[in-house]
């Protein structure tokens, strides 16, 4: 296809020029710029016309809100959807399609958009046009669209390209220092630049021909490291940025020659076995595509191989020679062009070309947009921790100094490889004892179930005909090997955590008979799904993104939410990154997924809240019966040869996208350090006042959590469904409290406003629960803020609330741009006809009519409690003044959320560690004293809790090194801090006069 030029940006407003002009511009975009044929144009125009009314009502919400940019976004969305969903299967139509094909990167180039902004705005288009796309392309349209997979692939390539650039720059010089003359220097620079491009193009060829479906981040990193090995032994030694005699960097074999692959494994945390296998695959790609003759490196006398152990290395005589490098690049370019014709929306060469205008400079993270209000690089945005170092910090090796998403993934994979992989693939002796102690021996049932479920999650390709030698056969074989390895890892992790849970459960129940739990089908599937999700998260696959494990195991988000906390608690050495992943999943489940149609939470809710049954049934929210094991096995067998079809539940109502936000972890009796990004902490759990410490320590047995909702709870005098719903609601309230507090701090509102918003949210959850159905909890929180502001006569507009919400780490635009409303309700029949509206329309038409009586009760004492008093009409400008303080102080209803939540990390000494926010940490801890603190998320060793570093810190404090100033650490036990001191320093009392240690000071601690 010829190079495409941008369209003329001089367009008029869609509301001014009318639909006909918009259609003409869209036709010119398609036919004039993308050279589409008449058939493709007709199909694109059909989708455009059916969605045109949605564009008219939502144009101002797209991008920056300018008419021309909004049109460009909508054109790109329409063409992307049409192309992805209208692919033909028969040969003739496929041939026509290839002749008339256009790629997403070409659409964006014409529209003057970039990938980051495109993926940022795409979710709200999907939510708005979902019913239209379903009618035109079938109910499985979202699965075939693969928008999340494309976004994850883009993020991975961004990370991999930066990893490759950093590694190449570290290993090789930009020019050779000993050359003389300007032309020689230029030629030298061109050669290194071409070598750099050659490495990336060879990596793309490896992805196309060797990695097939499972292009996970760990496998791709192994591929890049294998290419670095090939570059090292083929690029002339004079361009190296290192010396083979550098003993600190390289692993020596027999104290003489360097083991190159082992050295690279040490540098980049790769598996040596996997790297050696990947090097073999890379050599095959070089041999077959570039037609190079391989020879054993041990038989070559090239100077590049000096001081290198040449055993098992392959050398290509003319590879990367200046005379042939240009032609080799042309061959790789042609090979990639051929692959792009068949499949691919993203030209992966863009990452080596540094086309910032097309790639974008904002950040995408983990398949979800990270809305921070500032533009930062992808690698720094997705980096899980901020590394803090100082001259006094404990020693860290150079490879650990910089934490990036790639290095974190490789470290996590190393944990899976070294801790989990050596375990047995069968239940241990102790676990078998629990399985045999049930009313009947369930060992065989557990083994059979695990095999079926894990084969459904990690399916094998069809067995190819051994008489046919083809690239497909090779990739299918590697797919099967990859899937089998992941199945084994998930299986071993499942047995390991299951045994730990059984042991803990037996202590709670004072017996080994766990029949109710170990015969519960739903519990085992949740455990298998959790184990598989951790394996997938470790390898960071593109093709299996959450919630795929839910769909393939037949469970729901509510089911999985019951085991996540227990899973984390009973797998002590779980790396921090995987803890964060599970915590973020739990938060996604709580904030929206559990409220979606088809959630088993509604089945429990009909038992716990019978008055909601009619509304739940009217909206069709109940979950379908869980598919049997036989049905899953049959589906997996029928799908052999490809990924099993993922049945998408009808979740279009209320679908609000994936929100990233602070994470939630543990309970009070866990002896693990809470991460700084947790959305609650052990101390916060206590201060929330939802459950006392005793009820937490004596937590309900897991078998009660997975029992039938109608079954009476053995100890609580209520049904198991009521217990499950109450526990779930308590988690929702905790999450809402932290998010409300974050918004209050950002907007600098008073404690009274915070308490009223929190109380209103609690009352809505308890008394107007149906407002949460098919919605996101942030939508309710935002409406609570505005309603409380109106009733408190506070000058705060919805625009200001949304402006500040967009700065929150968990924000996504579709939360306030697409709120579900029930078109079948009588109050909506004469409205716009949309089932998703903006949050202001939702507030006026749905929220206020339902919540007004609750709001009126929260009005300050000096405000008349008139039911019609200023709680609606959110489109009007707020002109009221600030709310005076109530006449008399009262005990705060809002849970205390101190900035520095102390965690007791020693059973012997009163030693606390506080997870400071980064802003507080930078302000309170000077550069010279950072080594005295264990900062949450920081550690001197891989996948180790930072609390383990306290011993090293105390040893430094108790050492003989003199400290500047007049302090004498030899006369006090600096490792001990009294409980009362911590309590006096850190607890917020929120108006509880005389009831706490801080009351004597008379001064209130200010939150950040």
Swiss-Prot record:
Taxonomy, superkingdom: Eukaryota
Source taxonomy: Eukaryota, Viridiplantae, Streptophyta, Embryophyta, Tracheophyta
UniProt region (Disordered), positions on chain: 375-394, 865-899, 988-1008
KW Signal (keyword) present: no
GO cellular component: chromatin; nucleus; transcription regulator complex
Segments of this protein annotated with the region Domain A: 404-605
GO MF entry, a single one: RNA polymerase II transcription regulatory region sequence-specific DNA binding
Entry similarity comment: Belongs to the retinoblastoma protein (RB) family.
One Pfam match: RB_B
Keywords: Cell cycle, Nucleus, Repressor, Transcription, Transcription regulation
Name recorded for this polypeptide: Retinoblastoma-related protein
Skewed-composition ranges (Polar residues): 380-392
Main localization (coarse): nucleus
SMART domains documented for this protein: DUF3452, RB_A
Region feature (Pocket): 404-853
Record's subcellular location: Nucleus
SUPFAM superfamilies: Cyclin-like
Residue numbers spanned by region Domain B: 723-853
InterPro entries linked: Cyclin-like_sf (IPR036915), RB_A (IPR002720), RB_B (IPR002719), RB_fam (IPR028309), RB_N (IPR024599)
Spacer: annotated segments: 606-722
Gene3D superfamilies xref list: 1.10.472.140, Cyclin-like
A GO biological-process term: regulation of transcription by RNA polymerase II
Role: Regulator of biological processes that recruits a histone deacetylase to control gene transcription. May play a role in the entry into mitosis, negatively regulating the cell proliferation. Formation of stable complexes with geminiviridae replication-associated proteins may create a cellular environment which favors viral DNA replication.
Cell cycle recorded as keyword: yes
Disulfide bond entries: none
């Amino acid at each position: 296809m010829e190079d495409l030029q941008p369209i003329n940006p001089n367009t008029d407003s869609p509301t001014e020029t009318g639909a006909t002009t918009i259609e003409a511009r869209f036709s010119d975009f398609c036919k004039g710029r993308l050279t589409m044929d008449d058939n493709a144009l007709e199909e694109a125009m059909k989708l455009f016309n059916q969605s045109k009314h949605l564009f008219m009502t939502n144009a101002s919400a797209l991008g920056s809100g300018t008419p021309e940019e909004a049109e460009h976004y909508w054109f790109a969305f329409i063409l992307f959807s049409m192309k992805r969903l209208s692919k033909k299967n028969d040969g003739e139509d496929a041939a026509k399609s290839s002749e008339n094909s256009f790629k997403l990167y070409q659409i964006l180039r014409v529209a003057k958009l970039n990938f980051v902004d495109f993926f940022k705005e795409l979710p709200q288009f999907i939510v708005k046009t979902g019913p239209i796309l379903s009618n035109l392309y079938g109910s499985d349209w979202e699965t075939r669209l693969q928008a999340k997979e494309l976004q994850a692939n883009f993020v991975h390539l961004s990370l991999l390209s930066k990893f490759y650039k950093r590694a190449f720059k570290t290993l090789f010089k930009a020019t050779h220092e000993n050359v003389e003359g300007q032309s020689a220097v230029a030629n030298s620079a061109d050669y290194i630049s071409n070598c750099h491009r050659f490495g990336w193009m060879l990596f793309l060829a490896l992805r196309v021909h060797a990695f097939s479906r499972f292009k996970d981040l760990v496998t791709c990193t192994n591929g890049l490291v294998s290419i670095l090995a090939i570059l090292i032994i083929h690029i002339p030694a004079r361009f190296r940025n290192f010396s083979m005699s550098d003993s600190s960097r390289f692993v020596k074999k027999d104290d003489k020659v360097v083991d190159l692959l082992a050295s690279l494994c040490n540098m980049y945390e790769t598996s040596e076995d996997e790297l050696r296998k990947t090097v073999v695959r890379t050599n095959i790609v070089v041999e077959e595509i570039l037609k190079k003759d391989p020879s054993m490196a041990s038989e070559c006398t090239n100077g590049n191989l000096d001081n290198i152990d040449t055993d098992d290395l392959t050398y290509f005589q003319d590879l990367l020679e200046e005379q042939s490098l240009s032609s080799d690049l042309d061959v790789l370019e042609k090979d990639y062009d051929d692959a792009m014709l068949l499949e691919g929306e993203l030209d992966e060469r863009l990452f080596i070309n540094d086309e910032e205008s097309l790639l974008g400079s904002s950040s995408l993270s983990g398949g979800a947009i990270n809305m921070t209000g500032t533009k930062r690089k992808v690698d720094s945005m997705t980096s899980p921790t901020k590394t803090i170092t100082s001259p006094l910090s404990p020693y860290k090796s150079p490879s650990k100094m910089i934490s990036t998403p790639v290095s974190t993934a490789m470290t996590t994979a190393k944990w899976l490889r070294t801790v989990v992989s050596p375990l047995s693939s069968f239940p241990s002796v102790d676990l078998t004892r629990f399985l045999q102690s049930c009313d009947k021996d369930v060992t065989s049932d557990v083994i059979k179930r695990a095999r079926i479920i894990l084969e459904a999650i990690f399916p094998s390709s069809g067995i190819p005909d051994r008489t046919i030698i083809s690239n497909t056969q090779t990739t299918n074989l590697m797919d099967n090997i990859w899937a089998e390895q992941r199945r084994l890892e998930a299986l071993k992790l499942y047995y390991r955590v299951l045994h730990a849970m059984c042991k803990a459960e037996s202590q709670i129940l004072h017996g080994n008979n766990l029949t109710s739990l170990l015969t519960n089908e739903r519990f085992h599937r949740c455990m298998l799904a959790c184990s598989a999700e951790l394996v997938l998260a470790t390898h960071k696959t593109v093709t299996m993104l959450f919630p795929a494990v839910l769909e393939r195991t037949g469970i729901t988000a509510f089911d999985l939410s019951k085991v996540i906390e227990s899973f984390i608690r009973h797998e002590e050495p779980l790396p921090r990154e995987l803890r964060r992943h599970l915590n973020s999943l739990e938060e996604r489940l709580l904030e929206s997924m559990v409220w979606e149609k088809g959630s088993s939470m509604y089945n429990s809710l009909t038992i716990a809240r019978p008055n909601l049954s009619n509304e739940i049934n009217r909206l069709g929210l109940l979950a379908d019966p869980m598919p049997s094991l036989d049905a899953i096995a049959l589906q997996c067998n029928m799908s052999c040869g490809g990924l099993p079809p993922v049945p998408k539940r009808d979740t279009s109502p209320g679908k609000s996208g994936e929100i990233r936000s602070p994470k939630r972890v543990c309970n009070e009796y866990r002896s693990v350090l809470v991460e700084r990004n947790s959305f609650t902490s052990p101390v916060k759990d206590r201060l929330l006042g939802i459950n006392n410490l005793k009820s937490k320590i004596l937590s309900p047995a897991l078998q009660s959590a997975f029992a039938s909702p109608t079954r009476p709870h053995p100890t609580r005098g209520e049904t198991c469904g009521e217990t499950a719903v109450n526990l779930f609601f308590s988690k929702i309230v905790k999450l809402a409290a932290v998010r409300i507090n974050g918004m209050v701090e950002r907007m600098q509102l008073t404690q009274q406003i915070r308490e009223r918003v929190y109380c209103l949210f609690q009352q809505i959850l308890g008394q107007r629960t149906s407002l949460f159905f098919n919605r996101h909890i942030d939508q309710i929180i935002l409406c609570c803020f505005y309603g409380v502001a109106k009733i408190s006569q506070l000058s705060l507009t919805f625009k200001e609330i949304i402006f500040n919400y967009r700065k929150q780490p968990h924000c996504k635009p579709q939360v306030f741009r697409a709120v579900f409303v029930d078109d079948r309700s009588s109050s909506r029949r004469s409205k716009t006809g949309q089932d998703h509206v903006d949050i202001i329309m939702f507030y006026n038409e749905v929220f206020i009519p339902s919540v007004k009586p609750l709001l009126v009760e929260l009005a300050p004492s000096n405000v008349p409690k008139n039911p019609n008093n200023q709680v609606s009409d959110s489109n009007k400008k707020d002109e009221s003044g600030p709310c005076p303080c109530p006449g008399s102080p009262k005990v705060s209803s809002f849970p205390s959320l101190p900035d520095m939540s102390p965690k007791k990390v020693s059973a012997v000494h009163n030693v606390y560690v506080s997870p400071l926010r980064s802003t507080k940490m930078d302000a309170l801890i000077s550069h010279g004293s950072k080594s005295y603190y264990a900062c949450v998320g920081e550690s001197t060793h891989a996948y180790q809790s930072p609390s383990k570093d306290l011993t090293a810190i105390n040893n430094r404090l108790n050492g003989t090194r003199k400290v500047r100033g007049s302090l004498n650490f030899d006369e006090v036990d600096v490792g001990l801090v009294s409980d009362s001191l911590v309590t006096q320093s850190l607890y917020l009392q929120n108006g509880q006069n005389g009831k706490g240690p801080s009351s004597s000071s008379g001064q209130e601690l200010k939150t950040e």
